[in-house]
Amino acid sequence: MTNADEQNMGQQEGTDTATTAQDTNTQTVGTQSENTQNTQQASDAQTEQTPAELRDVLPQLTGEVDEDDVLDAQEEQAAGQSARKVDEDGEEYEEEFIDADDLMGLLGEMKEMLEAQSKEIRGLRREMRELRESQGGGFRGGDRGGDRGGFRPREDRGGFGGDRDRGGFRPREDRGERSFGGDRGGDRGGFRPREDRGGFGGDRDRGGFRPREDRGERSFGGDRGGDRGGQGGFRPREDRGGFGDRDRGGFRPREDRGERNFGGDRGGDRGGQGGFRPREDRNFGDREFRPRTDDAQGNQEGGFRPRARADRGWANRRTDEE
């Protein structure tokens, strides 16, 4: 092969390569034009579907293209980290943040609330102290000497221990036992048992509760019957007066109010006027029945007189026509 042939072959290959490159460029341009046409068609279709009110607003909302590489990198890093974290129990929670100004305002409100509560507590303490001082008494070793105001323990309320003369609460052992009086000598004050309330045993001269056996027996007077003639104390039925041969008043049984002797216990010396009088003794004279025809039926006392009637007149006389 000669040099001329080689040159011809080289030119032919170069021509083929150029033709191929030209065809490739032509295809690329055609593809780009097709993509542009498709994009325009899609945009036109989207524009047609967009309402007329938004078509004028969308161009105004379109901003400048963000081409800051630093901001893009930070956004990608933030997007890679999730805002939700997992605690020890495996539950997800979202972190919440508060502004520093809001936090300071919240702390200020809490401070004001605590100050108001402290003032209220101080006022209550002052009122309680004044109340204790007004009631009297005191706690030993207090700020005012222990003689007034303050809390008083049980031993200091009065009467506890047997050596105090103040009133107040006294336990059962100190109110008064068989010694009759507790811490006051045994003769007054304190709780007194039944045997000490008075009149029990027949040898005491005080009043109070006396059992049935001590209120008064046949001796007529209980603990006062021996030296006072049986007047005091409970008196049984036989001793209330008028029973038997006694001249005092009071309750008298039926047998003693007045019998046929006309006067009861006072009939013997008063002519039968006192006491209960039976029917036969209410009028003097004879009790014979007298008919209505008797002329003296209205004049003589002791006779039978019918009940007065208004139609006959108060003279209560019958006429011959009746």
From Swiss-Prot:
Residues 14-31 have a biased composition (Low complexity). Residues 1-94, 125-322 are annotated as: Disordered. Residues 141-227, 235-269, 277-295, 308-322 have a biased composition (Basic and acidic residues). Residues 1-13, 32-50 have a biased composition (Polar residues). Residues 64-75 have a biased composition (Acidic residues). The lineage of its organism: Bacteria, Thermotogati, Deinococcota, Deinococci, Deinococcales. This is Uncharacterized protein DR_0269.
